[in-house]
Amino acid sequence: MSLKNSYVTSDYMEWDSMLSLVRKLYRDKEYRLSLLIGCGSFFGLRISDILSLTWSMLLDDEKFVIIEKKTGKRREIKVNTNFQKHIADCYTALGVVDKNERCFISRKKTVYSTQRINMLFKAIKSKYNLKIEHFSTHSMRKTFGRKVVEAAGENSEFALIKLSELFNHADVMTTRRYLGLRTEELLETYDMLSF
C-alpha cells in the first residue's frame, strides 16, 4: 500500500530477467505463477484481462479474442510460437481436465484477485532476489511495452505508435510516460551539459 500523497508506479523487468523468472518458477513447480508472468509479458494485457483467460483460449488456436474489461474494446491477441510450448507444458504439469477452466485459479478453485497476485509478487521479488523496485501486476504489461520498443531499434517511434493503439492510450505521449521513457528522456537532458 502506498503512502498518502506519494507517487508509486510499477517498474518493468528486463526481458531476460523476466524469462529467467518464468523458468525458475516453472522449475520450482509454481506453474500458474510462471504462466501468469509469461502471459502478462507476452500479451501486454491488463491483469483483469489476464485473469479471464481460459486454457482453451491459449491452447486451441494461435490467436484469441478478448473484450477488454476496462475499455470494453475488442482485442485480438496472437500467441507467440515460442511461448506456446510453455503454455502446453504448464497445462500438462497442472493436470488440467477442463479446457474451459480459467488458467489462474487458486487451490480453492477461485480466480486469484489482483491484490492476492500483488502479494504473491512481493514474495517472488524477495525469494528470487529480483532487481526491480516496484514489482506488481502492471510490471508485466510494462515489460511487454519496453521489449517491443527495444526490439524495434531505429523504428522505435513506429513501435510506440503501435503500442499506443494496443494499450488503448489517447496518444503516443501517454505511452511514453506509461513506459517511463519520457522521464528517462528528460533526465538525459542533464547529461548534455559539460563541466
Placement of each model-derived feature along the sequence:
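DNA breakage-rejoining catalytic core of tyrosine-based enzymes
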Residues: 1-19, 72-81, 100
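Active-site-proximal segment of tyrosine recombinases
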Residues: 49-50, 145, 153-168
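Short basic/aromatic active-site micro-motif
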Residues: 132-151
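Conserved tyrosine-mediated DNA breakage-rejoining catalytic core shared by Y-recombinases
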Residues: 52-83
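Active-site/catalytic core of tyrosine-dependent DNA strand-transfer enzymes
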Residues: 18-19, 82-132
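Basic, Lys/Arg- and aromatic-enriched nucleic-acid-binding interface segment
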Residues: 2, 13-43, 154-155
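Alpha-helix N-cap/helix-start motif at helix boundaries, enriched for small hydrophobics
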Residues: 36, 44, 48-53, 163
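Catalytic-site neighborhood detector that most strongly recognizes the C-terminal catalytic loop/helix
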Residues: 68-71, 167-192
